[in-house]
């Protein structure tokens, strides 16, 4: 919440807190303030910490004169600008995606984003030059153009995330998290698995090495978050955030490493080696924990449900089990996904972009073998039939009745699988289809990897009745 508030509010809140605690007779050795690198002002404008850090310090000294104040910031924390990021990657010898000023130089597809992004807002993957032109209009309409629009090469791969604690010299990684959805889906909207299930030991060692380099180069005394992409065995860095992240509570809970406590002690000058949790990569827990995002699309009218670089989830649930598939099933059920035995007339609808069609053949075949009747729009239907998966054609949203809307309203559709090749225009048939599914409370899957995870759980003979309950407090000993 603080990222959306003017900087002086941080000072005022801090001063009020200290005054209230003093009245109660409580005193403190000091206060650690970790203000966001940038946020939105009262008029919606982007402000950067680097522009007001000295003003913030002077205000804090004035109102907190007798209480020591520790800032969890350093020379880089005030927002890793593209130039600073590029310099750091060169000095640490870590590879990254190519970044230029023209999509002709980079090569399509490209990730387009404003210089300063909150929650992936207005970040888009462009697959064609027409997409670049269309999306540039979207970005410039909503973003202050005092800062450039950035282009990065988009590489399809597995996305992983690391939260680490550093004392300025040594570092501790409680665990490496792997996302089910591939790169291009915001980490907050992706299913997240700990420990990582599909990384080689060499890839894990590389991430640990790179994270240590970043922590030392940034002179971190506290927390740092790094996001990686793995493609064809090579590890690339997506972004480095010298701050806490939304995954800290998750990874702390499932590993038993109290990250915030340790980070605070590092801020105050203690060393990780003296804290009892070791350094480097912490040993994996004896179970699997799956974090599944929760969405509120039924309350957000007009919002497209298609996954992408812009975050849309409003919460998350946690599934824990001895193995990955059981933990995933728990998480999906907790997030509101329904798992039911198909009836004699139960059906699924497929309408997917060309690049996803090959991967959806296996998904469709699995659903067909379970007893579902399959329907698809013209292109998807033709593709599935061509590859020996019986499918019935259904007219799209703008077609004559009976069309896909009538089928959705029939009460027979259990799942909709819809992926778009185009933008977010609410008048597009694909966007209208997904919104209609939301209105009718029909699960709508918009990513290949999510579809694979869902179908694997549907085919499993496990249910909540035969998956053991897990008491997380008994799985490790808190220190």
Positions of predicted regions on the chain:
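S-adenosyl-L-methionine
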Residues: 1-30
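Local beta-strand N-terminus motif with an aromatic residue
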Residues: 27-29, 108, 413
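Conserved proline-anchored active-site loop of SAM-dependent methyltransferases
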Residues: 28-42
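C-terminal substrate-binding/active-site "lid" region of AdoMet-derived donor-dependent transferases
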Residues: 44-106
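General beta-strand structural signal in soluble alpha/beta enzymes
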Residues: 112, 125-126, 151, 175, ...
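ATP-dependent carboxylate activation and anion-phosphoryl transfer catalytic cores
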Residues: 119, 127-343
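Peripheral docking tails and interdomain loops at the edges
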Residues: 121, 395-479
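Short internal beta-strands
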Residues: 349, 367, 371-384
């Amino acid at each position: 919440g603080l990222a959306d508030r003017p900087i002086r509010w941080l000072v005022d809140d801090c001063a009020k807190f200290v005054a209230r605690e003093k009245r109660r007779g409580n005193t403190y050795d000091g206060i650690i303030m970790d203000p966001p690198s940038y946020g939105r002002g009262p008029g919606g404008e982007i402000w950067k910490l680097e522009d007001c850090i000295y003003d913030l310090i002077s205000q804090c000294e004035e109102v907190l004169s007798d209480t020591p104040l520790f800032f969890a910031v350093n020379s880089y924390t005030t927002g890793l600008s593209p130039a600073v990021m590029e310099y750091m990657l060169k000095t640490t010898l870590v590879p990254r995606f190519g970044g230029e000023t023209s999509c002709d130089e980079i090569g399509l597809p490209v990730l387009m984003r404003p210089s300063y992004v909150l929650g992936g807002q207005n970040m888009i993957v462009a697959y064609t030059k027409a997409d670049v032109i269309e999306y540039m209009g979207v970005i410039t309409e909503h973003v202050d153009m005092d800062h450039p629009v950035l282009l990065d090469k988009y590489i399809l791969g597995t996305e992983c995330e690391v939260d680490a604690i550093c004392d300025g010299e040594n570092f501790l990684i409680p665990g490496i998290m792997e996302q089910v959805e591939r790169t291009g889906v915001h980490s907050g909207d992706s299913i997240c698995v700990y420990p990582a299930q599909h990384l080689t030991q060499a890839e894990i060692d590389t991430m640990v090495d790179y994270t240590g380099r970043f922590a030392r180069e940034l002179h971190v005394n506290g927390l740092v978050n790094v996001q990686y992409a793995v493609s064809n065995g090579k590890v690339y860095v997506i972004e480095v955030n010298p701050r806490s992240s939304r995954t800290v509570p998750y990874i702390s809970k499932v590993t038993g490493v109290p990250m915030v406590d340790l980070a605070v002690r590092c801020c105050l000058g203690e060393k990780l080696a003296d804290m009892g949790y070791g350094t480097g990569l912490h040993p994996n827990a004896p179970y699997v924990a799956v974090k599944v995002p929760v969405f509120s699309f039924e309350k957000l009218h007009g919002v497209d449900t298609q996954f992408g670089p812009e975050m849309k989830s409003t919460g998350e649930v946690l599934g824990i089990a001895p193995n990955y598939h059981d933990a995933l099933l728990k998480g999906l059920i907790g997030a509101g996904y329904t798992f039911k035995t198909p009836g004699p007339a139960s059906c699924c609808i497929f309408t997917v972009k060309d690049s996803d069609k090959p991967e959806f053949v296996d998904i469709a075949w699995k659903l067909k073998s379970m007893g579902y009747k399959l329907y698809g729009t013209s292109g998807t239907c033709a593709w599935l039939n061509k590859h020996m998966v019986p499918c019935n054609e259904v007219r799209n949203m703008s077609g004559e009745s009976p069309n896909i809307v009538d089928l959705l309203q029939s009460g027979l559709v259990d799942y909709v699988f819809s992926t778009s090749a185009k933008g977010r225009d609410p008048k597009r048939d694909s966007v209208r289809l997904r919104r209609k599914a939301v209105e009718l409370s029909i699960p709508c899957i918009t990513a290949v990897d999510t579809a694979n995870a869902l179908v694997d759980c549907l085919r499993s003979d496990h249910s909540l009745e035969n998956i053991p309950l897990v008491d997380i407090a008994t799985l490790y000993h808190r220190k």
